[in-house]
């Protein structure tokens, strides 16, 4: 995974590199794709997406974060393929996007409605709070968008008393689906009767259903959720 330089601070942590790796594997961006992002913040995901997609439209409602994203894009020599828009989604979202990422939960239901209306093929949303993850899973399912829900946690090792201990980050819930071919079955192939599946293709978070084991692991990603 190519290095992402983030010399400018948005007073909000960027999406961690390990989370970006999983995110990008799910988005599966190609040079012909138009990628839309809700909440560019520091621009970490924006930079990664611009290295893969043909076009990127990134929305950010806070002007100071738009400027931070702009500076970090320049620091990574990312230019003409990215359009930064100071706007609060769903206002300002393109109507021809192939893939969409929601880095937070603000106005997410209206954004999902936009994805359905404009048949966005791949939709991924990152959530850090359990209660929001449950509500968002229901919103994805109600709109026929849900393909899978992945929950994972990153831990980094550090030396402690001559041995290795681990510092764990908060869990991330990643909702994956789309309104195009990716989730044309409304998620039925991924879910039995309802509930959120965990990573690994086995059991759900409530333990009563199974999801197909076709998703790629973080190790399959070519590169590497809050940005």
Where are these regions (language model features)?
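Class I SAM-dependent transferase core
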Residues: 1-31, 36, 41, 67-74, ...
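Short SAM/SAH-binding signature in class I
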Residues: 97-104, 122
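C-terminal substrate-binding/active-site "lid" region of AdoMet-derived donor-dependent transferases
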Residues: 116-173, 225-226
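Conserved SAM-binding motif I beta-strand of class I
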Residues: 55-60
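S-adenosyl-L-methionine
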Residues: 63-99
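Core SAM-dependent methyltransferase catalytic element
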Residues: 162-194, 199, 206-227
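A short, conserved alpha-helix within the catalytic core of class I
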Residues: 107-115
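Conserved SAM-binding loop of SAM-dependent methyltransferases across substrates and taxa
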Residues: 42-53
């Amino acid at each position: 995974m190519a290095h992402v330089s983030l010399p400018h601070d948005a007073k909000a942590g960027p999406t961690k590199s390990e989370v970006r790796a999983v995110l990008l594997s799910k988005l599966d961006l190609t040079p012909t794709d138009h990628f839309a992002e809700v909440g560019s913040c520091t621009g970490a995901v924006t930079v990664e997406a611009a290295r893969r997609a043909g076009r990127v439209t990134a929305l950010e409602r806070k002007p100071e974060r738009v400027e931070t994203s702009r500076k970090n894009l320049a620091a990574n020599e990312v230019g003409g393929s990215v359009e930064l828009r100071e706007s609060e989604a769903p206002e300002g979202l393109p109507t021809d996007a192939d893939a969409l990422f929601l880095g937070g939960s603000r106005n997410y239901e209206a954004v999902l409605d936009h994805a359905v209306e404009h048949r966005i093929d791949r939709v991924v949303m990152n959530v850090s709070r359990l209660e929001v993850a449950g509500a968002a899973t229901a919103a994805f399912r109600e709109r026929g968008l849900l393909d899978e829900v992945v929950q994972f946690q990153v831990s980094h090792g550090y030396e402690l008393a001559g041995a290795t201990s681990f510092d764990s980050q908060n869990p991330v819930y990643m909702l994956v689906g789309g309104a195009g071919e990716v989730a044309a079955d409304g998620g039925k192939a991924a879910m039995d009767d309802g509930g959120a599946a965990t990573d690994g293709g086995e059991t759900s978070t409530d333990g009563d259903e199974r999801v197909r084991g076709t998703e790629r692991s973080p190790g399959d990603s070519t590169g590497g959720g809050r940005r």
